[in-house]
Amino acid sequence: MDTRVDTDNAMPARFSAQIQNEDEVTSDQGNNGGPNGGGRLAPRPVFRPPVDPASRQAFGRPSGVQGSFVAERVRPQKYQDQSDFTPNDQLADPVLQEAFGRPFAGAESLQRHPIDAGALAAEKDGAGPDEPDDPWRDPAAAAALGTPALAAPAPHGALAGSGKLGVRDVLFGGKVSYLALGILVAIALVIGGIGGVIGRKTAEVVDAFTTSKVTLSTTGNAQEPAGRFTKVAAAVADSVVTIESVSDQEGMQGSGVIVDGRGYIVTNNHVISEAANNPSQFKTTVVFNDGKEVPANLVGRDPKTDLAVLKVDNVDNLTVARLGDSSKVRVGDEVLAVGAPLGLRSTVTQGIVSALHRPVPLSGEGSDTDTVIDAIQTDASINHGNSGGPLIDMDAQVIGINTAGKSLSDSASGLGFAIPVNEMKLVANSLIKDGKIVHPTLGISTRSVSNAIASGAQVANVKAGSPAQKGGILENDVIVKVGNRAVADSDEFVVAVRQLAIGQDAPIEVVREGRHVTLTVKPDPDST
């Protein structure tokens, strides 16, 4: 549809007449006929707004131009024959001619490189091969890949070898430095030496696997372990004694060890407790390794550690045992248990340390010992009569005091338990000096507990005014750690408390209603 504004042609007469009579042909409500009473209304004329001269000059059809502004290639067929916009050759602008034209009139075209002179001559003569279409010279030619602007660099030729060096060139030709020769010789010697060692070892291994001869290795020290035990046993034999407490109706027997040249002997409390409680009815005697019997006097005893100290007088040339350090004992160390089991004096049994810090409860008929010891566990046999004797290491030093033995039957085999010598030193020194010893206490009683929440010592009751009450420990708290020692049950709690220092703050960790709480408690001395 042509929408151009045509101002040159006159408006049709019928539209002019209709505009003039516009008021006459305007439809009214209820009027179904035209001005002449017809049945149809005449259409409203097309409204053409007035055009000012400036708009007509800017947007009007140019003078002498016919047809629409449609490009020729998309113009309808009826307009194809119009030649209004056919391009014609025109001279270029003088400025463009000067910039892009030939430099001089009549000059030849762009020159070729002299190398291509033959190709140019052949091209002029028509004898050369047909050149492909050049889109730079022929706009109608199709685009194609041509010769690259820069030729690929030619590969470098392989370096010519200088030839192999002979032995004469290497040694006397001066082409290899003497330093390099020395290094090569050293490397060759090292490689040769390593190869010789490997070859020798390989031959020995192969011979060992293939030979039919069997050789047993023997040395002059084949009896060294047995000899070592013999020397250790002999070194401590005279420092071990047998202790006998006898009344008119009964008697008890155990062992002891001499710890001081003045005649002080350490033994277990349960060995002499009956005699200590009834001194008028019992007589205590010490029997030395040579069979000499000497009466003994009680210096002091401690039921809470099951230790006691006796003293013999007027005995010369006593053999004092060497005391070791139980903190250096390790599981697997070889040990000897020395004593008088079943009344057999100077009996030695051998074993190893199988555990450390083993809480072992002690109690027995006829004894006031009711405590827990922090024992060294050993598989060396400790039987009735061994109690109070020393547990010896391979340096002939006392590392413990044999105290208890456990077995599945009445046989001699089983496990033995000894009080560590470091604890024995503290107790013995206090008993020798003061005749008694005090231990730390918290003022609570406990029972063992183990469940999904906690395992330890559950507080059964708390004594009024005790260190535990002052420190905030409550009933039903489960104590899981005392100081630096974990507590697994009530027996271990007893041992852990005994290792605290009286009057010094100690951390106590408890589980209270599922929560871990750390309290500070200052132990008091016990009353006994």
From Swiss-Prot:
SUPFAM superfamilies, alphabetized: PDZ domain-like, Trypsin-like serine proteases
Regions crossing the membrane: 179-199
Keywords, alphabetical: Cell inner membrane, Cell membrane, Hydrolase, Membrane, Protease, Serine protease, Transmembrane, Transmembrane helix
Molecular-function GO term, any one: serine-type endopeptidase activity
Topology class, membrane: Single-pass membrane protein
Bias-annotated ranges (Gly residues): 31-40
Gene3D superfamilies assigned: 2.30.42.10, Trypsin-like serine proteases
Any Gene Ontology CC annotation: plasma membrane
Role of this protein: Essential protein that may act as a regulatory protease that is conditionally activated upon appropriate environmental triggers.
Subunit structure: The C-terminal region exhibits both monomeric and trimeric forms in solution.
Protein name: Probable serine protease HtrA1
Classification lineage: Bacteria, Bacillati, Actinomycetota, Actinomycetes, Mycobacteriales
